[in-house]
Amino acid sequence: MMNTIRRLLQEHGRLHMPVAQLSDLDDLYGAGLTPFAAIRTMLALEEAFDIEFPVSMLRRQSFASINAVRDCVTQLLTSAERRAA
């Protein structure tokens, strides 16, 4: 999952540095992530993981760090699994 998140951030995040240079806790907005790039990344994540970000997750905090993105994706995947069961 983390490799996919990092790849999508590299492709869509328009960061000022390579994602490989960022720790999982680094501030993505400090690294150059804009609101527009966050939305582009969110759409790519939705497609890659077959999830949909609810309005409640459309917050700056959801994309504050790689770990924050991972937490959102994990929560959405867990919710989808519960609905499928």
Language-model regions: role of each:
Residues 1-43, 47-85:
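Phosphopantetheine-dependent thiolation modules in NRPS/PKS and related acyl-activating systems
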